[in-house]
């Protein structure tokens, strides 16, 4: 990860959408949320969103990056505003980790992670985007780093099983003191 000198770094929170036209490193942390990265390989511009839910009923309200369809619309508008077409971008999808796997089959619990994954895949298809990579589903959280100067996306996935195992080992070490 050779970082250009003086590169900006932006951390996205849930519901945020960022689009940059200069070398920038974008970061986010995902659980059941999904991140979509947009990168234009010739212009080396792009952005990322961190959406929380597939959609909402919107009546005369401004676009809101918390919702998949609206976050995608924001990214597409940025692409067009920069004289590029959405189809020219390399798109990657990340996240949608089940954070409560014990409740997976509970009929009273809505599976937000699965809904987000389906929404992201459907939006990529509907908008005829070049889906280059995806790391979706499973359990746990992901840390995402997206470098706009070269289009690389770095993912660290921590499945729930690994977190539970780490917690048990820590408890065993602590109990021995």
From Swiss-Prot:
Keywords recorded for this protein, A-Z: Chemotaxis, Hydrolase
E.C. no: 3.5.1.44
GO molecular function: protein-glutamine glutaminase activity
GO biological process: chemotaxis
Reactions it catalyzes: L-glutaminyl-[protein] + H2O = L-glutamyl-[protein] + NH4(+)
PANTHER family in alphabetical order: CHEMORECEPTOR GLUTAMINE DEAMIDASE CHED 1-RELATED, CHEMORECEPTOR GLUTAMINE DEAMIDASE CHED-RELATED
Family membership: Belongs to the CheD family.
Protein name: Probable chemoreceptor glutamine deamidase CheD
Organism per entry: Pseudomonas syringae pv. syringae (strain B728a)
Encoding gene per record: cheD
């Amino acid at each position: 990860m050779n970082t250009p000198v003086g590169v900006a770094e932006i951390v996205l929170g849930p519901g945020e959408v960022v689009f940059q036209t200069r070398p920038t490193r974008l970061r986010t942390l995902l659980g059941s949320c999904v991140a979509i990265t947009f990168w234009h390989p010739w212009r080396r511009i792009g952005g990322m969103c961190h959406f929380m839910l597939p959609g909402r009923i919107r009546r005369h309200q401004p676009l809101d990056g918390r919702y998949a369809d609206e976050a995608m619309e924001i990214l597409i508008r940025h692409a067009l505003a920069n004289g590029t077409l959405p189809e020219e971008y390399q798109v990657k999808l990340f996240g949608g980790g089940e954070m409560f796997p014990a409740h997976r089959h509970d009929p009273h619990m809505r599976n937000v992670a699965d809904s987000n994954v389906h929404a992201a895949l459907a939006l990529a298809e509907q908008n005829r985007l070049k889906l280059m990579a995806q790391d979706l589903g499973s359990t746990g959280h992901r840390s995402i780093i997206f470098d706009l100067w070269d289009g690389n996306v770095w993912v660290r996935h921590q499945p729930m099983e690994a977190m539970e195992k780490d917690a048990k080992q820590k408890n065993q070490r602590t109990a021995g003191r």
